[in-house]
A protein has these predicted regions:
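Sec-dependent N-terminal signal peptides
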Residues: 3-14
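Subset of outer-membrane beta-barrel
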Residues: 19-160
Length: 160
């Protein structure tokens, strides 16, 4: 019986020392000067092409066609070859709703390879990217529904 309690307590406290790692962290970089200036509070104000990123349901209320983009030298004091690109597009189709999408690219620059003894090896370039498709349509004067589909890829090393 004592062994059961020890095992149970071990399982409970094992999570306290678990290592957590985040993947595709570049998806948390907020695109657009307006949303960044508002502390990323863009979900309720989905009135432009950035709605495909923040709130695809907002596309349902938009008419016309729009393209928007953003380029940022990411962490310029750390390295000169880090940059973030974002481009988005939306197009309204009468009687259906609005289609949209965006492309995100974060260049992490050139990485310097080292072996376990500190000797230089081959250098390589790292990057992260994502592409998303969006659709939004209004259900009534005050409500809409939207969907987002996103695929991302990271190349952090030349080694598998």
């Amino acid at each position: 019986m004592k062994l059961k309690y020890i095992l149970l307590l071990s399982c409970v406290f094992a999570q306290l020392w678990a290592v957590g790692e985040a993947g595709a962290i570049f998806l948390l970089i907020a695109p657009g000067a307006g949303p960044q200036g508002a502390g990323e509070a863009q979900v309720a104000k989905a009135d432009d092409a950035y709605a495909s990123y923040y709130n695809p349901a907002g596309l349902g209320f938009l008419k016309g066609t729009e393209v928007a983009g953003m380029h940022v030298n990411w962490l310029p004091n750390l390295a000169s070859d880090l940059y973030y690109e974002f481009i988005t597009y939306r197009h309204h189709i009468d009687g259906l709703g609005s289609l949209g999408g965006h492309i995100i690219y974060l260049n992490l620059g050139e990485q310097i390879g080292m072996d376990e003894f500190g000797n230089p090896t081959d250098n390589w370039k790292s990057y992260m990217g994502a592409i998303a498709g969006s659709f939004g349509t209004h259900l009534s004067e005050t409500s809409a529904i939207g969907f987002n589909f996103k695929v991302f890829h990271q190349k952090l090393s030349d080694q598998v």
